[in-house]
Amino acid sequence: MRRSVLAFVLALVMLPPAARGDIAVQAYPLPPGGGYPHDVAVGGDGTVWYTAQRSGQLGHLDPATGKVELIPLGAGAAPHGVLVGPDGAPWITEGGTNAIVRVDPGTRVVTRWPLPDGHGWANLNTLTFDTRGRVWFTGQNGIYGRLEPKTGAMDVWDAPRGRGPYGITTTPGGDIYYASLAGSYIARLDLDTGAATLIEPPTRDQGARRVWADSKGRIWVSEWNAGHVSRYDPRRGAWSTWKLPGAQPRAYAVYVDDTDVVWLSDWAANAVVRFDPERESFEVFPSDRPAANVRQLQGRRGEVWAPESGADRLVAYRTR
């Protein structure tokens, strides 16, 4: 069944790019009733999907025109994470109805896979895909799980240390890791059994929030409590840690771009931060809006996207 949609053309109010060094920054305001973007996912065609969490919708932005389309996800929806899958469709961790959701990119038909009975409200967070096309996901209330879209079979496991599973990522080699904010660890998942192997970061109670893999399969972690960005090298079993600039940084999101440069959001600085691992240097891009609250970062070659949930807009950082 086709869902009703709302479309807005915002080309007249798109903010022009602002240049800073080799980066051009451009903001895209979102329409009334379709703001509070939580996560973003960039499609292969360069358009951007985002979760409008407070209105229970999935947004779709065309950066070339500023047009925003809003797709309702149903009564009670409160979408959190979104990722474009290997099928080209946006997949969503839909926390409001405790389900994994797919939106057909052509028809806009919404399909949902509810969590099995007995697991309660999971506070679903983030998802990723393995090399077999299966969806792996986290729930902050203490679970992680796996969905086989072909059959609808879903497995859910209790996380070690209970509450906390947050960000999740797939490495180029196909391994899957997640971070636990409340548990202060990362874990590698066995793709056959679902078992989680805990890996302890060197800083105690660091608050590992989100994770991303670089081209070499190393795991980058944003540490919310400690204000660090850390890197775990699975081949060596070794950690490296860097503190973000400022007195009391709060590292929320982390994303590694196609050149293995690391991007983070720092809530204390109200900024997006770029980290060059080779030079071990940081560059800070403060938002021009107060309390922008970037909760996630994602991108494609040459550009990084930041959803500013506190400013109701999406911001692109493009390499010039």
Residue ranges and their predicted role:
Residues A7-L15:
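Bacterial N-terminal signal peptides
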Residues G21-G34:
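A short helix->beta-strand "capping" segment at the edge of beta-propeller domains
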Residues Q26-P29, E69-L73, T111-L115, D155-A159, ...:
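Beta-propeller fold detector
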Residues G33-D45, A75-D87, G118-R132, R161-G173, ...:
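Beta-rich, blade/repeat-based domains predominating
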Residues V48-R54, P90-T97, V135-N141, Y177-A182, ...:
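Conserved beta-strand positions in repeat-built beta-propeller and related beta-rich domains
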Residues Q57-H60, N98-R102, G142-R146, Y185-R188, ...:
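A short loop-to-beta-strand structural motif that recurs across blades of beta-propeller domains
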Residues D62-G66, D104-R108, E148-G152, D190-G194, ...:
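Short loop/turn segments that connect beta-strands within beta-propeller blades
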Residues W224, A247-R274:
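Loop/turn-rich, solvent-exposed surfaces of beta-rich toroidal or solenoidal domains
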